[in-house]
A protein has these predicted regions:
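General detector of folded, globular domains
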Residues: 1-96
Length: 96
């Protein structure tokens, strides 16, 4: 069964690849304004953009916490199996 989602561009706070830490764990950097929030990490099979919305065929969705990194940034940690994959991050509205 495939899951599909339509996400407005203004709700996506990060779109990019999952990077690797020195220990091999995956992470996503973001601004410190989201520190302490919960975030949905959406890993797509494929996606399209029409100028206002992303249309995503979902492979996996995770709900993770945003952790401090230093004074100006924070990050979300992920497993090694997600390294290099494209992802979208949307903040949970209840946690803003």
């Amino acid at each position: 069964m495939k899951l599909y989602a339509k996400i407005p561009m203004k709700e996506v706070i990060y779109k990019g690849k999952i990077k690797r830490t020195g220990t091999g764990q995956g992470y996503i950097y973001m601004n410190d304004e989201y520190l302490g929030c919960r975030a949905y990490i959406i890993i797509p099979q494929k996606y399209e953009f029409d100028g206002a919305d992303y249309y995503i065929t979902i492979d996996e969705v995770m709900n993770k916490g945003v952790h401090p990194d230093n004074d100006h940034t924070c990050r979300i940690f992920l497993s090694r199996s997600h390294l290099g994959r494209e992802c979208f991050v949307v903040i949970d509205d209840d946690m803003r």
